[in-house]
Amino acid sequence: MQLGMIGLGRMGGNIVRRLMRAGHACVVWDRDAAPGAALASEGANAAGDVALLVAAMSAPRHIWIMLPAGEATERMIATLSSLLAAGDTIIDGGNTFWKDDIRRAKALKEKGIHYVDVGTSGGVWGLERGYCMMIGGDKPIIDRLDPIFASLAPGRGDVPATGGRDGRDPRVENGYLHAGPNGAGHFVKMIHNGIEYGMMQALAEGFDILKHANSLNLPAEHRLDLDVADIAEVWRRGSVVTSWLLDLTADALAKDPALEIGRAHV
């Protein structure tokens, strides 16, 4: 399947690479020519500007935007809406505010252009691990894009399905969800990010306390010299706080046990 990608930063570029590994054809553009040239050397078609990207694609076109939320994305959607034709699709894979998705989808629909919002989680590790995706939009368009989502998703791997899921959408177990209409994808991702930040803050607070358990401000008999790297490692193995975020914390502490945890409060 052919996909256009606008924005070739740390996530956009790796999304293209993962798609090309799966046999998809990618037409790419970034305002910085260097990442486009790098991807061209790997098999992508690097366009000189947005209009040339659109011209290089076959109808119906599917163009994924991976830009910072806000003005940059708004400007790009306005540009694309003047270049695309009825039946084409714009996919926003960034962290757009979900109410903006609803507004955009309504405006684009008047031109016959489809809009899909994709909350994308996986970061720079997604190239190898895959991306968890929370998707909002009309079902026929989501179904048309399924080969793209299936290639980007992590797949089932060795994670067992939760019991009692008989009859539910099996794509969820592969790592991507059609959450609902436009806005639903980014709404779910917004809540995901809030949970993530809370977990990160809890880890930071906990390890900060452990790191300073030998503070000279404590009575001598209450001081504890603790190895925070070893604590992180043991918690990875069977504890109820096991998580990928803990894995990343353990990796960072193993490389630098004196890592500055940061302020333990907000």
Task: Please state what every model-predicted region is.
Residues 28, 48, 65, 92, ...:
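Hydrophobic residues in well-ordered beta-strands that form the structural core
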Residues 63-79, 97-100:
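Beta-loop-alpha module in the N-terminal Rossmann-like domain of NAD(P)-dependent dehydrogenases
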Residues 1-62, 87, 124-127:
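NAD(P)+-binding Rossmann beta1-loop-alpha1 motif at the extreme N-terminus of oxidoreductases
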Residues 86-89, 93-143:
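Rossmann-fold NAD(P)-binding glycine/threonine-rich loop
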Residues 130, 134-136, 144, 151, ...:
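Helical "substrate-binding/catalytic lid" subdomain
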Residues 67-69, 95, 120, 153:
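Short glycine-/small-residue-rich Rossmann-like dinucleotide-binding loops
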